[in-house]
Amino acid sequence: TYEVTQSSYTTERFPWPEMRLTDLYLLYAEALNEKDDANNRELAISYLDQIRARAGLKGIKESWDTYSRYPNRYKTQEGLREIIQRERAIELMFEGSRFWDLRRWKTANKVLNEKIHGWNFEGETPAEYYSQRTLYTLKFIAPRDYFWPIHQNDLVVNPKLVQNPGW
């Protein structure tokens, strides 16, 4: 809820856990694929197909066999991993899970260190406006940023604790 005044507003936050069945299906498919067994891969594909069917899309096998440049991608562990990661990025877009997925997959240092490009919105001519420029660069330092620092008080209380790398 919020109240608006002439110069300011106040907000109240109500945190609650939010998880959709789709997220659980995607996590389960990811876990099944990591087991690296043909039967598990088939089961993982069946869960992905349920998600795609809800969205009105064809299943993984039919889609990749028909439309992909790499029709055999879903037949290998690595290929299905890429498919699952892409499905997660699309299905859970703007829900706040991408950063945590990148950390879990250990790809954050690659993806988050890319330059963010955009148009020159201050340009006065079409040529200036549509010219691409770097807006900003993110900085994710591996392995440090995959872990959080252990609070100094905890290190003092328990001298057997060791600070995480980079902190």
Positions of the model-derived regions?
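Acidic/polar-rich alpha-helix caps and helix-coil junctions
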Residues: 1-167
